UniProtKB/Swiss-Prot annotation:
It comes from Homo sapiens (Human). This is Tyrosine-protein kinase Lyn. It catalyses: L-tyrosyl-[protein] + ATP = O-phospho-L-tyrosyl-[protein] + ADP + H(+). Detected in monocytes (at protein level). Detected in placenta, and in fetal brain, lung, liver and kidney. Widely expressed in a variety of organs, tissues, and cell types such as epidermoid, hematopoietic, and neuronal cells. Expressed in primary neuroblastoma tumors. The keyword Ubl conjugation applies.
Amino acid sequence: MGCIKSKGKDSLSDDGVDLKTQPVRNTERTIYVRDPTSNKQQRPVPESQLLPGQRFQTKDPEEQGDIVVALYPYDGIHPDDLSFKKGEKMKVLEEHGEWWKAKSLLTKKEGFIPSNYVAKLNTLETEEWFFKDITRKDAERQLLAPGNSAGAFLIRESETLKGSFSLSVRDFDPVHGDVIKHYKIRSLDNGGYYISPRITFPCISDMIKHYQKQADGLCRRLEKACISPKPQKPWDKDAWEIPRESIKLVKRLGAGQFGEVWMGYYNNSTKVAVKTLKPGTMSVQAFLEEANLMKTLQHDKLVRLYAVVTREEPIYIITEYMAKGSLLDFLKSDEGGKVLLPKLIDFSAQIAEGMAYIERKNYIHRDLRAANVLVSESLMCKIADFGLARVIEDNEYTAREGAKFPIKWTAPEAINFGCFTIKSDVWSFGILLYEIVTYGKIPYPGRTNADVMTALSQGYRMPRVENCPDELYDIMKMCWKEKAEERPTFDYLQSVLDDFYTATEGQYQQQP
């Protein structure tokens, strides 16, 4: 595509403010997965109010309106779906959350399309190197994921300044190994972009082409765009209570307290995880209350609930499929055993991010441990199993009579009084950190549940293990404070773990 002009930003200077350094230590990072639950609707922008990343263009009369181009091919499953090929242009007729009604300008057919498979024509979103709605941290995870190498790069939107962009590049440092360098992209008042004020470009596309030919002050020449995995298509429109025959169970993945977990397919097309509930375990009404609660928790660090089957037993709960299974099993596997400490801490940061979301939503998990965290093919961690979670009014929740909970992961006040809060989840998170840094070992090794309860009442805490940094152990001890109110928030834990290695270093590279 051609140049995409910048609209001047008065708040941005063009005098070349110095930028700082953001190294990332030697570790593979996970691929960022865009939140599939976003229902943001993008409306057409009048040409007199173009945004950064758009340009004036005369369109065919037939193309008047919102025109999108396919980033990936899509084969329709339902009669009202519209199939399309990569690069095909379509006119958006109606927007329905994650599914839009569109007309192909090639075939003239109409139907529903997955909105995350397309991008607005003549925007940066059509470029393979542009990653929309991605944080600096997730950009690092994406670039350090398997399949990318030194010279891989992406352009992302600024997290703090709307309409601004940053360039993130994978480099190799003899001391630190694989690192990510970030460069702020500045806008000129009269249009155009620059990283270094000594050379400017009319559009970001021209800037990329220049730095693909020569480093010209960057850490290295830009080579290949960061690999972007094909997104999972949105769940079917209005498919909540689904027919049992629409689910095909393929492979049993495991069994838990309330039933089994299977890999299966919905309508023979969408790979899903299926939790089956043992008959008589709980009432359909109680199950639906839990399922409806879980459905409200939508974040890219939480396993997403898709649908349920409740008309007869066994009850099914349909969630997104995570290829590498539980974090506990992964850590104990050959592959997981090769993961280095920086990546283990990144796992912790991802889990803290998901729990920070739960914290903001005034929920509790009640059973946070490595067995209830799942891992994707690209090593993205997502929190699962909200079967015992409950919305709370006064930040207090009393366990039901006879409820089973894992002693070694549970805070003393929850063990002794049955009261669960987000702060008891923080205690459990500290135990989860122990699981992670020991590659899945059972907490309090050699001690029975009764021994643990007695030891905790006497102020005992697990000692630091050999490969655990002092700073990480300090975080564990914060989580294990006797007084719940003295334990940190998940928001704080996320911020500390996100920048565990870089807290005292700058974020951006000096201008070339």
